[in-house]
Design a protein with these regions (language model features):
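Extracellular polysaccharide-degrading/modifying enzymes targeting complex plant/algal/animal polysaccharides
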Residues: 21-332, 371-395, 649-653, 657-699
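Predominantly extracellular beta-rich ligand-binding scaffolds that present long acidic/polar faces
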Residues: 71-78, 85, 89, 538-648
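Extracellular beta-strand/beta-solenoid scaffold signature
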Residues: 107, 111-120, 262-272, 301-316, ...
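Aromatic, loop-rich ligand-recognition surfaces of beta-strand-rich domains
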Residues: 264-273, 278, 293, 297, ...
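Right-handed parallel beta-helix
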Residues: 280-291, 322-336, 345-360, 369-391, ...
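C-terminal, low-ordered peptide segments at domain boundaries
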Residues: 702-728, 784, 791-815
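PDZ/PDZ-like domain segments forming the peptide/carboxylate-binding groove
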Residues: 716-759, 763-766
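PDZ-domain C-terminal substructure recognizer with occasional recognition of PDZ-binding tails
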Residues: 752, 758, 763-764, 769-813
């Protein structure tokens, strides 16, 4: 049977008219007067009593120990309000454990064996639940893959989760759930299975839980609530058609004595007022909230241009309140949001609370989208400068403001929904988060979803172990994306436009957001990530333990007096007139870490007096690398910061530290996180990193990385989090199109600058080398390319391209790529560029012979060697063959970029000059160890010519990393011209 609290009974008698205190207990009776000796049974009955007594004096409803199974959500309205001098309080009596439950106890179940360790029992007809609690712990639904606490994504994921081979085992999967990561790991998405086709293809609906939707991630996906997947201890399945509960009890669980609970309600307590008639001065104190249903399929509402959608609800729900307080409560294992603060709320405080294992957000503040003057969505490109609403600030007051989250411990939120945060702030103003410890979460610890309307303060918080299941994010994340961002007709990099329109950038971000005196650590992103136009921020006294600090786009950011341990400052895609200030910080890297386009003019408004830490540095010296990049930093230095005790997390600097002379001011290292003794005793703290000992003198060295070309476009590998964020990629992989000349083969195929190549012929492309391998394997057949452009995937086809074949032989007797006879070759004159080749004379490269020697080789460490061939006149080139010898078993590999020029006179050696030279092919055979001799052949698809050129340059790069870089022992170069037509 299902046991619920007793129903409300009897009206309130006159005997309670002057009472200030009421009592409730699960073993009480609603027929009782509500005294400590004769308490009520239900909270609804106690609420009636409090309503009658409120307003004349403080009213307190004391809850005695036990579980209060709510028949329906307990709803407070303006009729429940107190006053400043006569507040209304609902609290646990003498700290007794009082639990508010949205569930139901399943009693007297008769368990019997089913199979393979699984038991079954009949439950009341009509019972539905999406969670099962056994002895107070939520158990996993029957799922695939099985739950594994050590797996990063979903505690178990598999690419074949919904493959036909898998689903063929499922008789009726309707009602099952699919959970998957966004393709770019920007949160999660969820689906309900609606059926299965005859070909075992699953039918489903959902995926709307992300404001920038995508296909499911190919690897990070799982299914649950599938009967046939019930195969691991702890898993359960409820067959609602037969009202049968199946459970695989873990070792040590005795179901004859265990407490079994199902979940019924989404919301446990609701505060439902309005701006005109708010719920006022009501406190909830010292209670435990448990058994709230999951709401991931109701998470549908897009939140303007953040990446989020939301469900406006939670275990504790506030809308339309003034001066209410949630204090010293434990919100445990609720299925959706723990606390949701919706639309109009003023001076709401959440203090001293312990929030653990929520399915959704910890505490979410979300205002009304219609309070924004320009509530644009991602697909809305209709706004234009000429018609823009230029009125600063919000349009209405229907949003949270002047609210506080104080001294709270919040961890392991986002157990189900991955686009969530322990503290979420969106369409709000003046939210303060103070002395909170936040950790073990899938995405950011604190997220501010837009610039509307600022005034938030994040201080003395300890936030770490974040972004554990997602990517391209930080322990703190914010987006701006305000009225000015991406506005049609507005170019804020233009000097005149900036002068005339600079006020636009603070129309929404009307108040400054302050982050101060916090400790952050993110091992899967940035410690602090001010993303996509985040503007009007002040960051002071932040200790960043791992991921550094990022500013992307945006305006008016002050970055001062922060410490970036083992990392540095990441400026991404700055506006020319950003007005950013970066000063008096301590960092590890001797250079900035930009991504995307940075202005050619001096960066920001001020970048100076920063210190690059070098332990045991004898004397401070200029931070030349910072200064060269920013064109500022005239007074920034490299020096020993002289930390007090960094191994123990004390990054204050000692007296006499050079940082103090730069304006750095010590800030406390012992006030991060919760201060409440009960919470501090159980709160974790971050691992203090082992300090890196950076090298380098701060000067910028010339880049030794060779330039890469594909289809005559310059490309490079995607590198690191910066690129992933700058180009909005699904991972830290791909090939970026750096430059796509108008007449290049890439341009003809439809490629553009800043395209990122993610796949070729269905195979993931992680690097340039991988792309070249796939291209060469295709040997002239059309290439199907998946391109990432402006957050979308675009299919392109490349039919016209050069490719290479390679042959290895133990002797000069090549079969597929033999030395061509003289009659097929273009006569040529060979030259070597500075610093000149060694050993054999350069002329041997065109003598028609292969030898076992070094050939005209470049010295070790020469990274810019080049050979140039003059054909005497421009000729149509059918094939280029290049031969090498594996001298000393390490010089046979070929690594060069082949360039061509049709200039009538010698074009010189600067192959990078696209006016004179065209890149023909990028070749690298290092992947396969050579035998004695190596031959390569470069041809064009469709038996077309490689081009019409007189001059050819082989820009060679060392083929090994030994001895400073050993160059290839080239033996012969042959040019086969196209037959005359």
């Amino acid at each position: 049977m299902i046991l619920l609290a007793g129903a409300m009974a009897l009206s309130i008698g006159n005997t309670l008219a002057h009472a200030a205190n009421f009592y409730a207990a699960p073993n009480g009776s609603d027929a009782n007067p509500g005294t400590v000796e004769r308490p009520f049974a239900s909270l609804q009955r106690a609420q009636q009593a409090a309503r009658q007594a409120r307003g004349r004096q403080p009213v307190t409803v004391f809850l005695r120990e036990g579980i209060y199974y709510l028949p329906e959500s307990l709803c407070f309205t303006a009729a429940d309000s107190g006053t400043q001098t006569a507040p209304v309080t609902y609290q646990a009596y003498m700290k007794e454990p009082a639990v508010i439950s949205g569930g139901a106890k399943l009693a007297n179940l008769k368990w019997e064996s089913y199979r393979d360790g699984i038991l079954k029992a009949s439950v009341p007809a009509g019972l539905t639940t999406d969670q099962l609690f056994v002895n107070g712990q939520c158990q996993p639904m029957a799922r695939y893959p099985n739950f594994d606490a050590n797996v990063r994504h979903f505690n178990g994921c598999a690419a074949d989760a919904i493959s036909p081979q898998r689903t063929a085992r499922w008789t009726d999967p309707r009602g099952g759930f699919i959970h998957a990561m966004h393709a770019a790991e920007w949160g999660g998405m969820h689906y309900v299975i609606t059926g299965k086709g005859q070909d075992n293809t699953i039918k489903y609906e959902g995926g709307w839980q992300n404001n920038r939707p995508s296909d499911m991630h190919r690897q990070f996906r799982m299914v649950e609530n599938i009967f046939e997947e019930l195969d691991a201890p702890g898993e359960w399945f409820l067959d609602t058609k037969t009202s049968t509960l199946y459970f695989y009890p873990p070792a040590g669980v005795d179901l004859s004595t265990a407490t079994i609970e199902a979940v019924r309600l989404r919301h446990l307590i609701e505060f439902r007022g309005t701006q005109q008639a708010p719920v006022r001065f009501v406190t909830i104190k010292g209670l435990t909230f448990r058994h709230a249903a999951r709401t991931f399929m109701e998470n549908k509402e897009p939140l303007v241009r953040s990446d989020w959608t939301t469900y406006r609800g939670g275990a504790v729900f506030y809308t339309g309140t003034d001066d209410c307080l949630l204090e010293d409560c434990f919100i445990d294992q609720v299925g959706g949001n723990a606390v949701f603060v919706n639309n109009y709320n003023r001076r709401l405080t959440v203090r001293g609370c312990h929030i653990a294992n929520a399915g959704g957000n910890g505490v979410a503040f979300v205002g009304d989208r219609d309070a924004a003057r320009v509530p644009r969505d991602w697909k809305d490109h209709s706004q234009k400068l000429a018609t823009l609403d230029r009125t600063p600030g919000p349009k209405t007051d229907n949003y949270p403001a002047e609210c506080l989250v104080d001294d709270c411990l919040i961890y392991r939120s986002g157990r189900v929904e991955k686009q969530t945060a322990p503290v979420q702030i969106e369409l709000s103003q003046g939210i303060t988060v103070r002395h909170c410890s936040i950790y073990d979460v899938p995405r950011a610890g604190i997220n501010i979803g837009d610039g509307c309307w600022g005034g938030h303060v994040i201080e003395f918080c300890d936030i770490f172990d974040t972004v554990k299941e997602t990517g391209d994010h930080g322990s703190f994340n914010s987006w701006g994306r305000d009225r000015f961002w991406g506005l049609n007709g507005l170019d804020l990099n233009d000097d005149k436009t900036w002068t005339a329109e600079k006020d636009l950038v603070r129309l929404d971000a009307v108040k400054t957001v302050i982050l101060r005196n916090n400790r952050w650590r993110c091992d899967h992103g940035w410690d602090i990530d001010l993303d996509d136009g985040s503007s009007n921020y002040e960051l002071r006294n932040n200790l960043c333990l791992n991921g550094g600090l990022k500013n992307r786009e945006g305006f008016y950011r002050l970055i001062e007096n922060n410490i970036m341990v083992n990392n540095g400052f990441h400026p991404h895609v700055w506006y020319k007139h950003s007005q950013d200030v970066v000063r008096s910080n301590i960092m590890w890297t001797d250079h900035y870490l930009p991504a995307g386009g940075m202005p050619s003019t001096p960066w920001g408004r001020e970048m100076d007096r920063n210190l690059v830490h070098r332990p045991n540095a004898a004397e401070p010296k200029p931070a030349a690398g910072l200064a060269k990049q920013s064109q500022r930093d005239a007074n920034s230095i490299i020096a020993d910061a002289m930390f007090v005790d960094p191994a123990q997390g004390d990054f204050r600097v000692k007296d006499g530290s050079p940082a103090l002379k730069l304006g750095f001011v010590n800030f406390p290292m012992d006030q991060f996180g919760v201060q409440k003794p009960e919470l501090k005793a159980i709160a974790r703290t971050p691992q203090i990193p082992r300090l890196m000992t950076p090298a380098g003198d701060g000067s910028i060295k010339p880049a030794l990385q060779r330039r890469h070309f594909v289809w005559q476009a310059e490309v490079r590998d995607i590198a690191g989090l910066g690129d992933r964020s700058a180009y909005g990629l699904p991972g830290e992989y791909g090939v970026l199109c750096v430059n796509v000349p108008e007449r290049s083969l890439a341009a003809k195929a439809g490629f553009q600058k800043d395209d990122v190549i993610l796949a070729c012929n269905g195979e993931t492309v992680r690097t340039v080398d991988a792309l070249l391998d796939l291209q060469n394997d295709s040997a002239g057949k059309p290439l199907r390319i998946d391109v990432h452009r402006k957050q979308g995937t675009l299919p392109l086809t490349v039919s016209d391209y050069a490719f290479a074949a390679v042959e290895y032989q133990p002797s000069p007797d090549f079969k597929a790529i033999p030395l061509a006879l003289a009659g097929y070759l273009a006569p040529a004159r060979i030259l070597a560029g500075e610093p000149g080749a060694m050993n054999e004379p350069i002329s041997v490269l065109t003598d028609g012979k292969l030898a076992r020697n070094y050939g005209p080789v470049f010295a070790n460490g020469v990274v810019n060697g080049a050979y140039k061939l003059d054909l005497g006149a421009a000729k149509s080139i059918a094939e280029v063959r290049t031969f090498s010898y594996n001298q000393n078993n390490n010089r046979g590999r070929q690594r060069f970029v082949l360039y061509g020029s049709s200039a009538t006179s010698d074009p010189g050696w600067n192959a990078a000059d696209r006016r004179l030279f065209t890149p023909i092919f990028d070749l690298d055979t290092r992947k396969t160890p050579p035998t004695e001799f190596v031959a390569t052949s470069i041809r064009q698809s469709g038996e077309q010519p490689l081009g019409i050129h007189r001059w050819l340059i082989w820009a060679v790069t060392p083929a090994t990393d030994n001895a400073g870089g050993e160059n290839t022992a080239f033996q012969e170069i042959q040019i086969i011209v196209s037959p005359a037509k």
